[in-house]
Amino acid sequence: MNYPLISEYVQSIRFSEENFDKLSNLCPVLDEDGNPVMFSGNFAIVFKMQDKQTGKLHAVKCFLREQEGREESYKLIASELEYVSSTFLTPIQYLEKEIFVDTTQGEDTEFPVLLMDWVEGLTLDKYIRNNIHDPYKLALITYQFCRMGSWLLSQEFAHGDLKPDNIIVREDGQLVLVDYDGMFVPAMRGQKARELGSVDYRHPLRREDVFNGNIDDFSIASIALSLKVISLKPELFDEFGEGDRLLLCAKDYIDLKHSLALNSIQKMIDDTELLQLLGLFYLAYSKNELSKVSYHLLKLKKPEYLSVIATVSTSLAVLQYCQGSTGIG
């Protein structure tokens, strides 16, 4: 099947009431210029839609190219998530021949869409950048991620492409995973992965035939370690962070001994929780997976606002004293 151009989808979405089959109650949310709010990627474009009756916001994903096994995979994922009750995930629904598009790309005019809840918030990397000078928020988001990571390790399914760009931080600080294209569910056992995930967050030995409930394990360990380090020493984010990369990248995974980021991290092992997460990272790296009991290594103490501020204030006071005593500054 040949899929429509982005411009053709936009035109169809403008008149969604006429062009949707079952979703005719949805209308596009428009930006300041009167255009539908949308986000595009390599394989799909996502529109922000609103239910005219309830006011609820939804995300409608329209596809730009063919992917083998996509329909079957989405149906299996939707079936699995139907019985999962968690704030970390949002339900999805795959609808065949849902949107009519007058396209020049082929003879087909009806195309599938994926319906999801719209998740309002910032991607994890943007949240870190916006709060890089707020030690409490950095500590709290590290704690929240480790809670989510611990929960994921206990599940039989896996997200498949765990990275900051696919983790949304709501206004209340809660985390939500989005983009389930690479998800593994037990019903897929024996299949090959449809995608391998971001190179900066996947294990260097991950291949398409490695497709099981453990494919998130290394990503969880890497992100958890990076967040903890940033919460303790934010300047390392400025030094090593780039794009949606927090600290570590594919180059580090290939040669740990010569990783500048890991070398900086190892100088901070006087912190008990950081040492704990560093051990988890090395364990995930050596085995390309973590056992179900490893989740306890992600259990961090919930940060208290006054405690974090007091620690930072003390550190600043010591620094100022040292500068005064040595004539620095």
Language-model features: locations:
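Catalytic-loop of the protein kinase fold
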Residues: L153-P164, V169
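Juxta-kinase regulatory segment immediately upstream of eukaryotic protein kinase catalytic domains
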Residues: M1-V37
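Activation of the activation-loop gatekeeper triad in protein kinase-fold domains
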Residues: D179-M183
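ATP-binding glycine-rich loop module of kinase domains
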Residues: P36, I45-T90
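Helical subdomain adjoining the active site within ATP-dependent kinase catalytic cores
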Residues: V229-L319
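Conserved structural core of kinase catalytic domains
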Residues: P91-H133
